[in-house]
């Protein structure tokens, strides 16, 4: 299988593990004083556990799981606002499937659907656009959610709706950006991070230079990585080489997919449709300056926040996390999922307490799927 099996070669993986061990010993990394490397992307977290890299790698390397899952960092208040919109009789509310079971303060979208709201799972914002064409008497709202990876497709749907004059199509925009929460983590005096594995899919869109501040301002290395086991091992090795050489740079291990300057067509669509919010709330991190996107005035007719007066366009109420939920601590690397008192007890994939157990990219779901269920017994 071209571009997959080549990156799962056991002999190559063994060689990388040996070189990682040599460098880890050289810089004095031990289980008691490990090198902390944060993998930002939830997809990387799942790959690490799927291939058992956390068990195979030198004990002086510790993976810290970052806030790179857009469903997981969505605060409960935004889920409540989705349900408020979806509960209107004129609305068809469209969402990706992984957002359906994320708990709000009282209900999830799945539970709201069971209670009678017209909520539909779609695979693309273009599916929602087609629903708007077929239902001119209904308001079709797409739940725009995700990092820079999914932001362009939502932008293209908004542009198309504007061209067609589809006034009954709007987007509840929850698109967020990756670099800003990394800065927030680095500014946290309680966080000890020695390097980063940068997100592959996000970087396909934005390129590698938006991360330059990590090396220039904080002196930390970041390596953009692919998702196969040897991709991740090579990225760890590249981070360790920088540390051993006393330097910090942004490097691109995933050069077969990620262009240095990103995807210019996607970036142009993002720039046309969106502008930065002054701040946006992240689960576990609070409000982070300039970390969220909102729809520009030129496309305001397709902005569900403005149309329905919810969210940042209306009166927002603070919503606390569910009692006992430690998602915030897990997403900011302060706690491993199995250290949470609710893991496998009050919080399971069947009955999730927090978003990290729901999403396909959540750290708690990864721990559960790849052996954490046994640890909880």
UniProtKB/Swiss-Prot annotation:
Keywords: 4Fe-4S, Iron, Iron-sulfur, Metal-binding. Fe cation binds at residues 41, 69, 72. The keyword Iron applies. Pathway: Protein modification; [NiFe] hydrogenase maturation. Its cofactor is [4Fe-4S] cluster. The keyword Flavoprotein does not apply. GO terms for molecular function: 4 iron, 4 sulfur cluster binding; carbon monoxide binding; iron ion binding. GO terms for biological process: protein maturation. PANTHER family: HYDROGENASE MATURATION FACTOR HYPD (PTHR30149:SF0), HYDROGENASE PROTEIN ASSEMBLY PROTEIN HYPD (PTHR30149). Involved in the maturation of [NiFe] hydrogenases. Involved in the biosynthesis of the Fe(CN)(2)CO cofactor. Belongs to the HypD family. This is Hydrogenase maturation factor HypD. The lineage of its organism: Bacteria, Pseudomonadati, Pseudomonadota, Alphaproteobacteria, Rhodobacterales. The gene is hypD.
């Amino acid at each position: 299988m071209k571009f997959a099996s080549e990156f799962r070669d056991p002999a190559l993986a063994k060689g990388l593990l040996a070189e990682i061990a040599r460098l880890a010993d050289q810089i004095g990394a031990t289980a008691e004083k490990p090198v902390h490397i944060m993998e930002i992307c939830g997809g990387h977290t799942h790959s690490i556990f799927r291939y058992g890299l956390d068990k195979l790698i030198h004990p002086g390397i510790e993976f810290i799981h970052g806030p790179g899952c857009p469903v997981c960092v969505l605060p409960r208040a935004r889920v409540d606002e989705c349900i408020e919109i979806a509960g209107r009789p004129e609305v068809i509310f469209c969402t990706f499937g992984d957002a359906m079971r994320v708990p709000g303060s009282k209900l999830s979208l799945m539970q709201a659907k069971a209670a009678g709201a017209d909520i539909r799972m779609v695979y693309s914002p273009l599916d929602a656009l087609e629903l708007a064409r077929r239902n001119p008497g209904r308001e079709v709202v797409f739940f725009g959610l995700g990092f820079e990876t999914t932001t362009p497709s939502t932008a293209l749907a908004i542009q198309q709706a504007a061209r067609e004059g589809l006034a009954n199509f709007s987007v509840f925009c929850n698109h967020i950006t990756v670099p800003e929460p990394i800065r927030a983590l680095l500014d946290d005096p309680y966080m000890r991070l020695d390097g980063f594995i940068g997100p592959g899919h996000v970087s396909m869109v934005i390129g590698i230079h938006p991360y330059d501040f990590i090396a220039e301002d904080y002196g930390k290395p970041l390596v953009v990585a692919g998702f196969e086991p040897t991709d991740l091992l090579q990225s760890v090795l590249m981070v360790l080489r920088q540390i051993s050489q006393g330097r910090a740079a942004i490097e691109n291990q995933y050069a077969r997919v990620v262009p240095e300057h990103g995807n210019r067509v996607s970036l142009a669509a993002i720039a046309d449709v969106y502008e930065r919010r002054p701040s946006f709330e992240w689960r576990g991190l609070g409000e982070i300056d300039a970390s969220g996107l909102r729809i520009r005035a030129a496309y305001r007719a397709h902005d569900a926040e403005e149309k329905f007066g919810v969210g940042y366009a209306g009166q927002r109420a603070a919503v606390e996390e569910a009692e006992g939920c430690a998602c915030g601590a897990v997403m900011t690397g302060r706690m491993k999922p199995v250290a949470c008192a609710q893991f496998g007890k009050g919080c399971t994939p069947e009955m999730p307490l927090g978003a990290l157990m729901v999403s396909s990219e959540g750290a708690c779901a990864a721990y559960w799927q790849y052996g954490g269920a046994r640890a909880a017994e």
